[in-house]
Amino acid sequence: MQLLLALLALAYVAPSTEDSHWCYEIQAKEPNSHCSGPEQWTGDCKKNQQSPINIVTSKTKLNPSLTPFTFVGYDQKKKWEVKNNQHSVEMSLGEDIYIFGGDLPTQYKAIQLHLHWSEESNKGSEHSIDGKHFAMEMHVVHKKMTTGDKVQDSDSKDKIAVLAFMVEVGNEVNEGFQPLVEALSRLSKPFTNSTVSESCLQDMLPEKKKLSAYFRYQGSLTTPGCDETVIWTVFEEPIKIHKDQFLEFSKKLYYDQEQKLNMKDNVRPLQPLGNRQVFRSHASGRLLSLPLPTLLVPTLTCLVASFLH
């Protein structure tokens, strides 16, 4: 009987991640922290098709079916609702914004976008490309639509499509990002809401002609419950924002109501790729990531053959 009571007590004090408050490593390390950092995330977070990953471009496989996307409603101007959700800044989307193409099985409706960042320009992205991390990473989250324009609620492997954009620090102000940056001061505390001045999603992204180069793999949400239901598209062309715009995120936003812990390093550690394959679109410009001899040998062979002829 005593053993049974001890086991029940242990089960009570060790709830799953879904039942307790999850957090990032920077929060879990705080004195008197009672939240579960990434190492303690449970459930699907312990499975083997998790995200984010490091994309090794030389090991990606060309997939001719990865054609350019069609973006519908991305040019729609609106005063979008934004909030501090205690883990990131989140912008609600929808209102006839959706994507198709890119070898997706059907249309996917935009639900929200959010970002991950550090206060250092090489630590804020969740994914990395050839070992390189970026200042930030923006996720535009879409859900699969069924007949009648309804969002699918099943647990299929392709339930969610996330478009991931790396964000790089540059010397010019990104006017498309500025409405969101200006709203940050109104979102300092968790669970606060505001709206951005009239803007459109398209203005936050790289030029449309540069969006045909991307990587694709099957993965998961990067936060609990880490559902393995995500088709990931990681674009090669980064978004560029000014350093001052970048720093506003870690200066203005806080994890806590007391505003003691600045929101930064909201990044899940890289997960093993395992036996998954990462694909690349035909437009991907990663040829130069190949070893130099691999590039030079065919070229020199052609030149010698031409000379002998």
UniProtKB/Swiss-Prot annotation:
Please report the stretch or stretches of sequence annotated as the Alpha-carbonic anhydrase domain. 20-282
Subcellular location, in the record's words? Cell membrane
Q: Which Gene3D superfamilies match?
A: Alpha carbonic anhydrase (3.10.200.10)
- Membrane-crossing segments per the record: none
EC number(s) on file: 4.2.1.1
What residues make up the propeptide removed on maturation? 282-309
Which sites carry carbohydrate?
A: 193
The family database entries (SUPFAM superfamilies) matched by this protein are listed as: Carbonic anhydrase
GO CC annotations on file = apical plasma membrane; brush border membrane; cell surface; endoplasmic reticulum-Golgi intermediate compartment; external side of plasma membrane; extracellular exosome; Golgi apparatus; membrane
User: Under which main EC class is this enzyme filed?
Assistant: lyase
Keyword check for Zinc, yes or no: yes
Q: Which UniProt keywords apply?
A: Cell membrane, Disulfide bond, Glycoprotein, GPI-anchor, Lipoprotein, Lyase, Membrane, Metal-binding, Signal, Zinc
Please classify the protein's predominant subcellular localization into one broad category: membrane
The record's listing under SMART domains reads: Carb_anhydrase
Q: What does this protein do?
A: Catalyzes the reversible hydration of carbon dioxide into bicarbonate and protons and thus is essential to maintaining intracellular and extracellular pH. May stimulate the sodium/bicarbonate transporter activity of SLC4A4 that acts in pH homeostasis. It is essential for acid overload removal from the retina and retina epithelium, and acid release in the choriocapillaris in the choroid.
Q: What is this protein called?
A: Carbonic anhydrase 4
Report the source organism.
Rattus norvegicus (Rat)
